[in-house]
A protein has these predicted regions:
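RNA pseudouridine synthases
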Residues: 1-199
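Accessory RNA 3′-end/elbow-binding domains used by RNA modification enzymes
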Residues: 1-38, 43-65, 137, 177, ...
Length: 317
């Protein structure tokens, strides 16, 4: 993120990395684990297993940031204790998947590719029969869909889509449009919001070993490697940073420009932003009331209107 800095503020004095420096017990009370879910268990079962692994620690609650089918693999963000307060951010975020669509007949690659491309943009979807939600038709946005490889009747797809998109149903619909029928045989989630599989996913086994190393030997090295501060959820979000006047107590329903010391240069009027204090702790989500340059220059006026406060997560300085 590129920041515009308020004139006169010593940016070098800001400690935006402070959330990583908190005691391990505090990190566990507001942390996120990026699990590489394996084929087999449900997302609920995985969260329950991890909760048991953390017995003997401050962790009493483990949620997850978006259901993966039992047969699906890939990124499953796990939310420890207070991190559950940002679950809605992850659930509503953009997702990416790689999967294998098996065609029920022989179709030339060019024909498959041309039909697949027609599914880019808004599509109508009805959740599958076994879905936990009401089976009503809804619109979902397919941002990008690419054929990575086709071998015979097997088509390797990469799909970037809006949250709530059923990739299995998408493949069925593509098969019907082609005319031969199709179904999904393998699915892996490669991105969830700001998180991608290149960012160091961990296995259930690695979590267990890390917890044991800390409880048995007092070695928190591995645990700090696998547990991330809740602020990581907002890594790819436009942000504003407020000084002591903006974070030294409960935030009002709006943020005054006089408290803003830095703002992402991409911010425009109406942009949803993450609000941090100068130590890097998350304070709120808000809607910017002006572009970035004005945020750091305008005197005493509304800079952003609060969408959701994160006082429950805690400003720890």
């Amino acid at each position: 993120v590129n920041f515009l800095i308020r004139k006169g503020f010593d940016w070098d004095s800001a400690r935006l990395g402070r959330p990583r420096e908190v005691p391990i017990e505090v990190l566990l009370d507001r942390g996120i684990v990026l699990l590489d879910k394996e084929d087999g268990p449900t997302s609920h079962d995985v969260a329950a297993t991890v909760k048991r692994m953390f017995e003997g620690t401050v962790v009493f609650k483990v949620g997850h940031g978006g259901t993966l089918d039992p047969a699906a693999t890939g990124i499953l963000p796990l939310l420890l204790n207070k991190a559950a307060l940002v679950q809605d951010v992850i659930l509503s975020s953009r997702k990416e998947y790689v999967g294998i669509m098996h065609l029920h007949g022989d179709v030339p690659e060019a024909n498959v590719e041309s039909m697949v491309k027609t599914f880019t943009g808004p599509i109508f979807q009805r959740p599958p029969d076994r879905s936990a939600v009401a089976r009503v038709v809804r619109i979902r946005q397919i941002e990008q869909i690419d054929i990575l490889e086709q071998v015979g009747r097997d088509v390797l797809l990469r799909v970037a889509c809006e949250a709530g998109t059923y990739v299995r149903k998408l493949c069925v619909d593509i098969g019907e449009a082609i005319g031969c029928g199709a179904h999904l045989t393998e699915l892996r989630r490669t991105r969830s919001g700001c998180f991608s599989e290149s960012q160091g996913l961990v296995t259930l086994g690695e979590i267990g070993l890390a917890v044991a190393a800390w409880l048995d030997d007092g070695d928190e090295t591995s645990l700090r490697r696998i547990v991330h501060p809740v602020e990581r959820v907002f890594d790819c979000h436009p942000a504003i940073v407020v000084g002591a006047r903006g974070s030294g107590g409960p935030l009002p329903r709006a943020i005054d420009t006089g408290t803003v010391i830095a703002a992402s240069d991409s911010i425009e009027n109406g942009t949803e932003v993450a609000v941090f204090d100068e130590n890097g702790f998350i304070l709120a989500r808000a809607t910017a009331a002006m572009p970035a340059a004005a945020l750091i220059e305008a005197p005493g006026t509304v800079a952003a209107k609060i969408i959701k406060l994160y006082a429950g997560i805690g400003n720890l300085v």
